[in-house]
Amino acid sequence: MNINFFEKTRVIDGGMGQELLARGMEPNGTLWSANALLNDKYHKLLLDTHIDFIKAGAEVIVTTTFTTRKTRLKDNGVEDKFEYLNKKAGEISQQAKSHFPNVLIAGGLPPQFLTYEADPRSEEEI
């Protein structure tokens, strides 16, 4: 990486999990964007979303690995997919970068335990 990279503000991509849901990905437990890695039918959607973030001005895209930690995968019954999901996230990010060689890829490194808990209440209950 060029040492001058940090001399100006850089734009990172947007909220991938929410964007994938907005584009039609069906939720799967608490996997969020990792569901797009787990389910082959969402791989193109994930790639296209990375590309759209780049076209919107992102100079850095983040791998969809925020929910691919072992504890989250175990909670969702797919702990055996740990290596596959993390490799697939890198592969799809690399595919997006291949169209835009100046874009950088950052790995999404989550905390190893819960960062938040979903609120199961309906809008009416809230």
Residue map of PLM features:
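Domain-level signal for soluble alpha/beta catalytic cores
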Residues: 1-126
